[in-house]
Amino acid sequence: MRLMGFDVGSRTVGIAVSDLFGWTAQGVEIIRINEDESEFGLDRVKELVAQHQVTGFVLGLPKNMNNSIGPRAVKAQEYGAMLTELFPEIPVDYIDERLTTVQAERMLVEQADTSRKKRKQVIDKLAAVMILQNYLDAKGPLTKQGY
C-alpha cells in the first residue's frame, strides 16, 4: 500500500506519499497549477503515481469552520474527480484539513525559524504531509482496504 496525499490550492498542489507500510508520510514536491487556464499538473501527477506505485489518493478537504463545504473544498473535490477520471483503478478519499496550512506555517516559523520566502516554497508540501499523516494516523478507509 502506498498512498499519495494532496494539498490542492489555487496556484499549487502539494504532494506527499506514504511509506509502504502506511506509517509515515513524506513530502515529494509542489506542482504549480493554473486553474484559470485549466492546467492542473496531471501529467506530473501521472509520473509520480508510476514512480511511487501509488494505490490510493487522499485529498485534503478544506471545510469551513461551521463544517460546510466552501469554494476551496469544491475545488478539491473537482481535483479528486479529475484523478478518478485519469486513474479509475485508484480510489480517492478525503480528510478534513481545516487549518492544516496554518499549522504547517506555524511549525515552520516556531520550530524551524524559516523565513517567509522559504516558507512559501515548502508550505504546500508540508501541508500535504500533514494531511496524509493525519489520514494514516486516523486509519482512514484506504489504509484498511489492502490497497
UniProtKB/Swiss-Prot annotation:
Its EC number is 3.1.-.-. Disulfide bonds: none annotated. Keywords: Cytoplasm, Hydrolase, Nuclease, Ribosome biogenesis. GO terms for molecular function: nuclease activity. GO terms for cellular component: cytosol. GO terms for biological process: rRNA 5'-end processing. CDD domains: YqgF. It comes from the Bacteria. SMART domains: YqgFc. InterPro entries: RNaseH-like_sf (IPR012337), YqgF (IPR005227), YqgF/RNaseH-like_dom (IPR006641), YqgF/RNaseH-like_dom_sf (IPR037027). The keyword Methyltransferase does not apply. It is found in: Cytoplasm. Belongs to the YqgF nuclease family. HAMAP family: Nuclease_YqgF (MF_00651). NCBIfam families: RNAse_H_YqgF. Could be a nuclease involved in processing of the 5'-end of pre-16S rRNA. This is Putative pre-16S rRNA nuclease.
